[in-house]
From Swiss-Prot:
This is 4-hydroxy-3-methylbut-2-enyl diphosphate reductase. The gene is ispH. Pathway: Isoprenoid biosynthesis; dimethylallyl diphosphate biosynthesis; dimethylallyl diphosphate from (2E)-4-hydroxy-3-methylbutenyl diphosphate: step 1/1; Isoprenoid biosynthesis; isopentenyl diphosphate biosynthesis via DXP pathway; isopentenyl diphosphate from 1-deoxy-D-xylulose 5-phosphate: step 6/6. Its EC number is 1.17.7.4. Dimethylallyl diphosphate binds at H41, H74, H124, S227, S228, N229, S271.
Amino acid sequence: MKVVLASPRGFCAGVNRAINIVEKTIQVYGTPIYVRHELVHNDYVVTQLSKKGVIFIERLNEVPNGSVLIFSAHGVSKKIQEQSKIKNLIIIDATCPLVTKVHKEVSRANRNDMEVILIGHSGHPEVEGTMGQYISVNSRQKIYLVESQADAWSVQVNQPNHLFFVTQTTLSIDDTAEIIAILNKRFPNIMGPRKNDICYATFNRQNALKNLAPMVEMIFVVGSITSSNSVRLMELGRRIGKITYLISHANDIQKNWLRGVNNIGITAGASAPDILVLQVIEKLRVLSTDHVVVEEMIGEEENIFFDTPKI
């Protein structure tokens, strides 16, 4: 059996930065420290940090006054920021800089009295945080969430000639392009960011999967079901026509999946550590009746690094 590893895969600069922030915060303040929402959407990462004394919460009333609170890589709304100040919390912001970029775009459009369309998935914490950057001062100023092409065709805005769009950073490149095309057709004067809001890591991992697909019969995407970019990779693999499984850890693999399969591709979402990929390879060695040969495809080299704030 041949196993081909997608490149790039796994951790992005924003995830590395968020984890480094938590590690440094533990060194400076000790434990417990609190993180609003999962720092990143990966069960393994959350479990490892929990073992070190990190407490993950969803509501601010779970955090004692004066405690250390870290905002997750997905970002938070302005309302959450203000509520945190009232509780006299020590706030450390691990929001990915590329998410912060989108927040600034929304705030700028808001200040310029523009309405905003956010392309994203309802309920995702990044979307909640981005929606929460917009403050409506009257009934004609709103931010709208568009999740699909159908939404793009049906959304009704108050100011079609004074409109700006942004996107969640972890969307399907192809789906988002189709939605933007519809918005441009419906609202010829709509404006958007000068640089794509979909982050480099999402873009690179989806392109890597497209390049990987012709080499293999089956694809494993290593990542959690709550990880937007991991789910998008799974959907992309299936859209291309490959049998594709999203697995959070090696034990998810079933032996009958491998019957008659000689070439398997592996990729990993931007919040999945490489140790999980290594565990998947070892699991395949155990389950396969053949010798397993591992190859890594040539892909886009990533050397992006985000500085961590002073703790």
